[in-house]
Amino acid sequence: FIKLFSGLKENFGQIKLHAKVEFDKERNKIKPEYIWSKQPIQPTHYQQHLEGKISIGIQPCTKDGKASFGCIDVDPENYKDFNIVLLLSYIEKYKLPLVPCRSKSGGLHIYLFLTEAISAQTMRDALASILLPLELKRTTEIYPKQIELEPDEHGNMSGNFINLPYFNHTKTKRYALDKNNTALSLEQFIKIALASRVSPNELDQLITRVDTEILMGGDPEFEDGPPCLQRLSKTKIGDGRDRFMFNYMVFAKKKYKENWPDKVNEANKYFSVPWPL
């Protein structure tokens, strides 16, 4: 567990367990209070987390700007209607070496583990590429959030930490999920997470493979355009027509210059139900 979640060692985050917890009624989300411990992380802190004595968070970015794990923080607009099964199906479809865990607030933390540390920037770039096959917005939060850390006025390294799974592991609500949306024990999680780790070279190959699979079969019109349009053009679009048309207009203005309004009129061919022009 410690090996998997090894990041910044000079500081770690905590949830104030006994503080008053807010609840966001609009999003059906718990909003606890967070603090930085302002002390180095020790093995005993991980153990206390698993025992439910403290709830810790780790900054994936080290003081050297490296990261051996990263996380996509899926924070839906409304937790009540959150479709976890659909996300799990995308992970399975593209054979992604990701480990999804329920988050404290009821969302999903999707972890990527590496056999050795890479630059925090490279980790962020890789996770940003993985957003596309998961059908997640480009604005989805990615950890590490920082690619380098600067000490504050007291000399403490901080930035942003990610809350770890398996707090109070025997009764936890922050558990990993298998492809069938079944909760995994701590022991099962560790075994699967260790087996899922990829090397930096394997990560490069993974991103190339996934990009190719997503874009293959898209309309040739978008070969020099944004991947999102090429991917969406593979099937008739039902939902999200407004978003597609906005992106298409930006694309058409750049590619077709004076002729772009005519191309926008022809874009209805991509929809199952015509967009009102």
Named regions from a protein language model:
Residues 1, 72, 164, 249, ...:
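A residue-level signal for conserved active-site and pocket-lining positions in enzyme catalytic cores
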Residues 1-69, 77-87, 158-161, 166-169:
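DNA replication initiation on ssDNA origins
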Residues 50-58, 90-98, 231-237:
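Short amphipathic beta-strand starts and helix->beta connectors
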Residues 58-62, 98-105, 141-145, 154:
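Short beta-strand
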Residues 72, 89-90, 94-97, 169-171, ...:
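Catalytic residues for metal-mediated phosphoryl-transfer on nucleic acids/nucleotides
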Residues 73-129:
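Structured, beta-strand-rich domain cores
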Residues 77, 107-123, 160, 168-173, ...:
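Modules that initiate DNA replication and primer synthesis
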Residues 124-174:
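Aromatic- and Lys/Arg-enriched surface recognition patch
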